């Protein structure tokens, strides 16, 4: 990771740039400029059903209207591109394959209907829903491969270490924030349609682009524990 400040603003082109997004962009831009760092614009377009090129152009125009220039990103390039997630799919697949090989991820064959039934069963018992039941976590590689070869649809899930302990985040605003790793689900990193999830792609990109500081709203603080689940 670079010793100099590298921050990013990574909007999803599912609509126009809203006030909250503009605020986050300004904070990141100002932090980079104040510290002689690099401000990166990245387009997080992993939602294929809602992301459009038109919205991307609207966001770029809005950034310029705000007087924000970017050092790396669309139209200016950079050493860590491409800067659109749909152009980085091979990087996410390579990372997922490495996690599979290291035993840190596994294929999940559970259907949406099964997952919905688990939630409904918990509600019927008046118990809090504990998330994914990890029924595919302990399949042997041979069992999983046989189901893949049979054409059974599957997603990829991260294998959160069972003895991980607490996830501790040092936040510049809130100080030390602690999450109980036992409450962290074996979250999906690749959907059954072959596309990466937002949280997975974002973590991969931040690592590969050498991002030193993540400036975003409080509503995203809980996402940080997902990225640190194997640290």
What annotation goes with each model-predicted range?
Residues 101, 106-107, 111-230:
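Active-site cores that bind ATP or allylic diphosphates and position pyrophosphate for catalysis
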Residues 1-124, 193-195, 222-230:
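N-terminal Rossmann-like or analogous alpha/beta NTP/dinucleotide-binding catalytic cores
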């Amino acid at each position: 990771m670079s010793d100099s400040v590298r921050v990013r603003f990574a909007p999803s082109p599912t609509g126009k740039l809203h006030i909250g997004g503009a605020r986050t962009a300004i904070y990141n831009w100002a932090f980079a400029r104040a510290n002689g760092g690099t401000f990166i614009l990245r387009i997080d377009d992993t939602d294929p059903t809602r992301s459009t090129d038109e919205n991307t152009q609207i966001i770029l125009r809005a950034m310029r209207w705000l007087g924000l220039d970017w050092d790396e990103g669309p139209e200016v390039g950079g050493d860590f591109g491409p800067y659109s997630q749909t152009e980085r799919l091979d990087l996410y697949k390579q990372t997922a394959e490495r996690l599979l090989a290291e035993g840190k991820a596994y294929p999940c064959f559970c259907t949406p209907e099964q997952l919905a039934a688990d939630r409904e069963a918990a509600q019927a018992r008046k118990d809090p829903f504990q998330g994914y039941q990890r029924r595919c976590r302990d399949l042997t590689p041979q069992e999983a491969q046989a189901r893949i070869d049979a054409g059974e649809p599957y997603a990829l899930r991260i294998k959160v270490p069972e003895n991980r302990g607490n996830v501790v985040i040092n936040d510049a605003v809130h100080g030390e924030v602690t999450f109980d790793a036992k409450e962290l689900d074996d979250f999906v990193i690749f959907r059954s349609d072959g596309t990466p999830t937002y949280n997975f792609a974002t973590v991969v990109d931040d690592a590969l682009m050498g991002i030193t500081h993540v400036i975003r709203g409080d509503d995203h603080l809980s996402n940080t524990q997902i990225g640190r689940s194997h640290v």
